[in-house]
Amino acid sequence: MASTAKILVTNDDGIHSPGLRLLYEAVKELGRVYVLAPETPKSASGLGITLHKPLRIGKVKIWGDTMVYITNGTPSDVIYIAIEEFSPRFDVVVSGVNIGDNTSIQVILSSGTIGAAAQAALLGIPGIAFSADIDEASQLEEDRETWENMKRVIRAITSWVLEHGMPEGVDLISVNFPRKVRKDTKVKIAPAARIKFLQKVSVLYDPRGRKYYWLYGTLVEPEPGSDVYVVHVEKAIAITPLSLNVNVKEGEWAAVVENIKPMIQAAESALRAQTSATVSTA
């Protein structure tokens, strides 16, 4: 499978991110690799797609003589454009390596890196998102041992998915690396924590006295065993299997239906009351 596999490489940090190069180097020998990434950073774009302007792609040579493609769209746009331009079917989409980890449901839902993998998964294509607990791109480039070890892990995980597919019940996989990856770094499966940050808002004023807002967050104490804990406290690699099924858990459905009946009745009563009022007025 590997030699004939079609692999799409993308990210949300933009075409010039060293994380994209690392990802390409890790998977380039596993099949036919296509690189299409946003021309500028699109962090925190989630599953967002572009509907208000034309999307375009272009070619550029980087990393020596490697031809890659750029777009003015989002990471999720990349999936649809790549299917249209390169292949109607990819065997896997790999996204990253993101500068900054994408741990916790709070972050997962806004991540453009995971958004690309999730968009692929929605179309039935295995998606894997890779992220690293670093603050600056230079940290990735300067630590060559971490760089090479991350490549080994990425290649192994991608190769496994190409050979075996996603495990049953799993739509995509999020992989988060600690700041340093050594040969004795542990690899653990970890569920996503609910939140990572306590979200805050700063209220400020520009030189003309107009109010503006700046969003930021402070880290909360991570729950042991969660992806945040594994990466930040244990300094291990966290593998988090994810499902796109956002429905209430099947076993809890009957109880939820029973508990929500009063709300449904209230909604129906509101409709009937409106109808009665309309009839009376007429």
From Swiss-Prot:
Enzyme class: hydrolase
Protein's UniProt name: 5'-nucleotidase SurE
Primary site of residence: cytoplasm
A GO term from the CC aspect: cytoplasm
Gene3D superfamilies: Survival protein SurE-like phosphatase/nucleotidase
Chain sites annotated for binding a divalent metal cation: D12, D13, S43, N98
Catalysis: reaction(s): a ribonucleoside 5'-phosphate + H2O = a ribonucleoside + phosphate
Compartments (UniProt record): Cytoplasm
EC number: 3.1.3.5
SUPFAM superfamilies assigned: SurE-like
Cofactor section: a divalent metal cation
Keyword Cytoplasm: yes
Cofactor detail note: Binds 1 divalent metal cation per subunit.
InterPro entries xrefs: SurE, SurE-like_Pase/nucleotidase, SurE-like_sf
